[in-house]
Amino acid sequence: MATTTTVDDAQPPTLQNILDQKSLKWIFCGGKGGVGKTTTSCSLAIQLAKVRESVLLISTDPAHNLSDAFGQKFGREAVKVNGFSNLSAMEIDPTSSMQEMIEQSEQRGGALAPFMQDLAFAIPGVDEAMGFAEIMKLVKSMEYSVVVFDTAPTGHTLRFLSFPSVLEKALTKFSSFGKSLGPMFQQFQSMMGGGANAQEDMFAKLEGMRQVITEVNSQFKDETKTTFVCVCIAEFLSLYETERLIQELTQYGIDTHAIVCNQLLYPPPGSQCEHCRVRKAMQDKYVHEMMDLYAEDFNVVKIPLLTEEVRGPEKLSSLSEYLMHPYQPPQ
């Protein structure tokens, strides 16, 4: 029989410990689609900017909602967020880097580029994995004190976190293949009149990315450097996805000890709204389940459903306070 977690047993319902843990370098926010991942990651980045020297917020979700959230256009270059001196943001497509690298090789005279493309994309997930490597290489060169990732919906998030091991294996084979057939490539390249070093450069770049991935992989599995914030709403499917996410993160060896539950209803006392009453009863059921499952080991943060859309730095800053100071429902 499941035991009920008491208030005394429960972890503090805030993300204060993430702000206090100055050794953290990588923070991921993820969960099912439509649960408020972007709002949560933006809010957390705003709070981190109060205690860290420099914060970078990255969207790896193809939908790219950071621009909408802040009301400011972001792209592939890190740009300061309006109103903040030490918070930057960028939106990148993890699938674009491999194709760009092949195109660069072709432009430099790589007659074997079509062959290289077929070979590269024959490795499952390598296009996204190469994008991931490019992202991490870029981010590491920027030297921000902490990086917050606004990830894609759960399935994409888990694949994103598996890229280091996928890419490490793939690039080991790819580099080995390149070294074995390198002389043949050069001879054929000379016959075709192309640049002799194009493929060598490509292999060198792949090898460099493999080294970056190996280092990042070890950092992701270091709880002093990396943590994952699970974002959900009080519904069955979202709770189910959260449990699956936590289990898979545990399998990857990635620390997770925080859950943010968004869009909670708190009708004012005496409210005659039948829809609100029924909806709140359903939410309460899943919140109780969540607390029983996680409150002893996780910081479970409850965020209210607001009456207006959260867009722009001011509203995000206001919402971010709920991550540090528990919301007090009307009595």
From Swiss-Prot:
GO CC annotations, alphabetized: GET complex
Residues that bind ATP: 32-39, 235, 262
Keywords from the UniProt entry: ATP-binding, Cytoplasm, Endoplasmic reticulum, Hydrolase, Metal-binding, Nucleotide-binding, Transport, Zinc
Residues binding Zn(2+), per UniProt: 273, 276
Summary of subunit composition and partner proteins: Homodimer.
Presence of keyword Secreted: no
Entry-linked HAMAP family: Asna1_Get3 (MF_03112)
Entry similarity comment: Belongs to the arsA ATPase family.
Single GO MF annotation: ATP hydrolysis activity
Active site positions: 61
Native organism taxonomy: Eukaryota, Fungi, Dikarya, Basidiomycota, Ustilaginomycotina
Gene Ontology biological process terms in this record: tail-anchored membrane protein insertion into ER membrane
Listed name of the protein: ATPase GET3
Stored PANTHER family: ARSENICAL PUMP-DRIVING ATPASE ARSENITE-TRANSLOCATING ATPASE, ATPASE GET3
Organism: Malassezia globosa (strain ATCC MYA-4612 / CBS 7966) (Dandruff-associated fungus)
Locations listed in the record: Cytoplasm; Endoplasmic reticulum
Biological role: ATPase required for the post-translational delivery of tail-anchored (TA) proteins to the endoplasmic reticulum. Recognizes and selectively binds the transmembrane domain of TA proteins in the cytosol. This complex then targets to the endoplasmic reticulum by membrane-bound receptors, where the tail-anchored protein is released for insertion. This process is regulated by ATP binding and hydrolysis. ATP binding drives the homodimer towards the closed dimer state, facilitating recognition of newly synthesized TA membrane proteins. ATP hydrolysis is required for insertion.
EC number, UniProt record: 3.6.-.-
Highest taxon above the source species: Eukaryota
Pfam family, one: ArsA_ATPase
